[in-house]
Amino acid sequence: MYIQLEGQILSYEKDGEGSPVILLHGNGESHEIFDVLSQQLIKNHTVYAIDSRGQGGSATPNSYHYKDMAKDVILFITSLEIEKPSIIGFSDGGVIALLVAMEQSDLLSSIVVCGANLSPKGLNGSALREIKKLYKKNGSPLVQMMLVEPNINESELQKISVPTLICAGDDDMIKPKETEKIFHNIPGAKGHIFKNATHSSYVEHSDALMSVLPVFWGEE
């Protein structure tokens, strides 16, 4: 499916029935990383799996900024009149989920933020080196975005007024202190660290999140 939002065309998949959930993938990926999780979620939820701008089946923009991607999600929710969705965002998608909730918590019922950072300094040294190496090799503006953004300060997180679950792997490329900083600055946030998990292993092609989502959403 496609939707045009103020000149930006986004590709997305919709499936299932029940309270709405929006899935946001990481940098250079597509909604397909959520294939296994979606199959569990659609049993009780209407799932909207979005390809962020310039990724998957979505149109390539003139430039890449997390705030523009967050605006896309806000317009997606309001244009389709999705009532109080929960957002699950991984990596870049987690950053976008934070920005949406900072801007318009009133649109949402909750956010689940997996492996997000507040700034490039929140990445560990080896991850940052790999991203720099990749940018040197391919010059991708999408990769460059990770080297200069996001720039979220702790006080901005306190604008978030929806139930929030912060997740990370115990072997994540996000520094543990960064995850703790996000957790401690969002009022009432809950947190979960996945054992024996990397940045992506508990999210991509995995339903490991189902071990925490029903409890967080009050479905158990």
State each model region's role.
Residues 8-59:
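Conserved HGGG/HGGXW glycine-rich cap/lid loop of the alpha/beta-hydrolase fold
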